């Protein structure tokens, strides 16, 4: 549980006190005024649809220990004094930076944590869930809830971690250069992985190389850790089929003294998968092996050939942190599918559906089509595809790729939903 005094929060974040006392202690942070109470810090954000500052008075009435706002709404200073709350204002009215500084301070107060950073274009949440499952075979683990992986979600993940936690698995997302540098500086991961470099957010970053370099920013925040289990030196896990792996290793990891683990299907990889097959339900079967000769057969509980690389990355990190390989693999193999990510939905007497509707990318759409067409089918195969956002000038080409990929599959019906980009798929 978080435990920081209001005075410590002011010092750590550079925020200013508008009104109210400074002698309280904050034990949790929320963005929802309905959760405000004694011991809680309510942080108001002016969002696109809702302005959290409008709910500051409600948080004060609920006796939140801290209420952070932009320009304080009328009457808030008086309410803070009346209810004994500390009303604060972030430096530059930057709520994101306030959270990052606060979470960074909490991280520094807990050097015993080994933080694992998870980033990549696709597969972050599934790999994060696999990692958390495998690491729990040995450690007390705190992990990102859902996909809270941005400049707000990552700090909230750290701020909800307890000093008794041993490993924190932190998913880190980005759609602009510089974001991962800020996230990594806050979380200070010791080990990290990059699932892949795809085309997600290419409209904002310009090219896949720019995406790769933005992902590689995670290296800049990595540092050794020391816990009851011993010292851990920084290492980064990469898939060997990542065509930017050499760039990331040579220009980022090596200069920073970060060891690189390679996973894939090459004989020289540190963790390998061989003999990959899919059963009638699309579930992968393969032989997992390590460079030292250890191997074990594996059948996964989630569909798709593409998830095998996620398993390899998770196993590489679990092994590096000293988790028994058999125990970690057993827990990972028994995991259910992550919600809305190639989730197979079935009901008696109803069609089998694959829900991959969360934040798709061209590569994840292709993976969903692969899974659909790998499953045994007694009826019709139907694909319903929507448009992919944040592709910029590459949108026509990449939507055309999706359409061509779908056309080459044994589908009985293809439904395209959208406007201009959907026409490009057709």
Which residues does each predicted region cover?
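Residue-level signal for inorganic ion chemistry
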Residues: 9, 40, 59, 102, ...
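Phosphate-binding loop of NTP-binding sites
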Residues: 95-235, 247-258
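Short acidic/polar active-site loop segments enriched in Thr and Asp
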Residues: 65-66, 166, 190, 412
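Active-site beta-alpha connecting loops in nucleotide-dependent enzymes
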Residues: 47-50, 54, 337-340, 357-426
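Acidic, Mg2+-coordinating active-site environments of NTP-dependent enzymes
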Residues: 75-79, 193-352, 378-379, 404-407, ...
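Short, basic phosphate-binding NTP loop
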Residues: 2-117, 126-137, 152
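Alpha-helical segments flanking ligand/cofactor-binding loops in enzyme cores
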Residues: 34, 57-58, 181, 209, ...
């Amino acid at each position: 549980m978080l435990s920081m005094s209001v005075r410590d929060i002011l010092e750590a974040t550079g925020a200013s006190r508008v009104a109210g006392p400074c002698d309280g202690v904050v034990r949790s942070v929320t963005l929802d005024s309905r959760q405000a109470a004694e011991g809680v810090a309510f942080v108001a954000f002016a969002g696109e649809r809702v302005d959290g500052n409008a709910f500051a008075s409600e948080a004060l009435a609920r006796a939140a220990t801290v209420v952070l706002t932009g320009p304080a709404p009328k009457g808030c200073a008086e309410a803070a004094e009346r209810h004994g709350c500390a009303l604060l204002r972030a430096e530059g009215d930057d709520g994101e930076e306030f959270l990052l500084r606060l979470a960074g301070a909490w991280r520094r107060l807990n050097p015993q944590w080994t933080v694992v950073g998870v980033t990549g274009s696709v597969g972050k949440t599934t790999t994060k869930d696999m990692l958390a499952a495998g690491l729990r075979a040995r450690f007390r683990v705190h992990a990102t809830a859902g996909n809270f992986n941005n400049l707000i979600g990552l700090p909230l993940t750290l701020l909800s971690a307890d000093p008794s936690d041993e490993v924190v698995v932190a998913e880190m997302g980005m759609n602009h250069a510089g974001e991962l540098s800020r996230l990594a500086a806050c979380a200070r991961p010791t080990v990290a992985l990059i699932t892949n470099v795809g085309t997600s957010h290419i409209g904002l970053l310009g090219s896949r190389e720019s995406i790769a370099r933005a992902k590689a920013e995670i290296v800049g925040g990595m540092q050794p850790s020391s816990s009851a289990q011993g010292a851990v030196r920084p290492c980064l896990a990469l898939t060997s089929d990542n065509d930017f792996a050499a760039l990331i290793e040579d220009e980022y990891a090596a200069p920073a003294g970060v060891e690189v683990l390679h996973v894939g299907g090459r004989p020289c990889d540190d963790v390998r998968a061989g003999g990959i097959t899919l059963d009638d339900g699309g579930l992968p079967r393969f032989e997992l092996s390590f460079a030292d000769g250890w191997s074990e057969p594996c059948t996964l509980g989630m569909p798709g050939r593409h998830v095998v690389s996620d398993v390899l990355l998770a196993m590489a990190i679990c092994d590096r942190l000293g988790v028994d390989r058999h125990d970690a693999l057993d827990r990972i193999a028994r995991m259910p599918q992550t919600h809305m990510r190639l989730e197979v939905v079935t009901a008696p007497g109803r069609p089998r559906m694959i829900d991959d509707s969360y934040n798709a990318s061209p590569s994840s759409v292709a993976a969903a089509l692969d899974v659909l067409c790998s499953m045994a089918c007694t009826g019709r195969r139907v694909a319903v595809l929507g448009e992919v956002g944040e592709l910029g000038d590459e949108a026509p080409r990449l939507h055309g790729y999706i359409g061509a990929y779908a056309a080459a599959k044994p589908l009985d019906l293809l439904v395209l939903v959208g406007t201009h980009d959907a026409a490009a798929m057709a």
